[in-house]
């Protein structure tokens, strides 16, 4: 069962809806009755909304309707209804949410991570803020635990995997991947960069904008990139250079290889007319001439600059 407690209050003529999501595993959608309770209307009203296209739904084989979190939030925004988390939940700011997510990631509880992200999203936190102000600081905090010898390398890797799993479960719950603007994007880490969480975060942001994202993940070689580009037309390539303990592409020992790979990618982009985006916390060791060929970003939200570049 979907363990969601719903509280409705009227304030200044507006309906404010509070949700308290239970500790058990979250379902990916709500039924007509649950949506009716959520908005304080009967089921027939929800059915009329759905039939008229006011609120999107997915019809099931048995004739029932399913409503995604994404579509519920979109509808609430259009109608001026404020969705909020239960007043008992005080974790809607980074200062209080981040330590709890880190704590549970270290406990290997991906369900808590997923639940927290969904609560934040339903509470009005934008996807861009979720990536910049919550998930990234969580990753920084986990790295700090490792740097301060509070956890082992293995524990750091597992905690990151837990965050990754929670994030991808969140994606399945709320991100509308049916949007399609007809554009294709390739996302990747270069060789010597192992973690793919930043690339996953960029993928979620781009897919929410309607881009078809082909995520190569980590440790992608130039040979593989050439193969992919020769077989499919891409509008843009996103590369992320990490500087954490398990990433070495920006270290002195590997920087020549990294610069060489970036130069090859620039040549491919020129040949196939592909826009280039390079993200990361720092580009200090990257050849400055090469950087001129990239649209640079240091925050995940800045990846959406792609919408403004012709």
Predicted regions and their residues:
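Short, intrinsically disordered or compositionally biased N-terminal tails of bacterial proteins
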Residues: 1-24
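Generic non-transmembrane alpha-helix signal with a bias for helix starts/N-cap capping motifs
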Residues: 29, 42-43, 113, 199, ...
